[in-house]
């Protein structure tokens, strides 16, 4: 069973979504609820994946859905601090083609 660690903070008009733990089918519904609450007001968002240990297709589906929701509302969603292990999965699934990914949270905040 997965373990979700999720946080929300603001930095310079950008909302930073701390995405961590193990996001699998068991916790993907809770992850989706937390993401929907966080992005409800629209705006500029950075997904901080520095604490993300593992993510399955269910969690990736939530990320893609939230990116689409944010963009449809005129907002921006990028990701940052993705480990090499997770980046391999994102690359295999072409997520890196759908969402801009920055090496650090600071770089991502400046970019959005």
Question: For each of these PLM feature ranges, what is it?
Answer:
Residues 84, 106-107:
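Acidic phosphotransfer microenvironment of two-component signaling modules
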Residues 25-98:
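Amphipathic alpha-helical interaction surfaces in cytosolic regulatory modules
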Residues 12, 50, 106:
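Conserved catalytic submotifs in the C-terminal HATPase_c
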Residues 100-104:
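Short acidic-hydrophobic, aromatic-tinged amphipathic segments that line or gate anion-handling sites
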Residues 2-33:
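STAS-typified acidic loop motif
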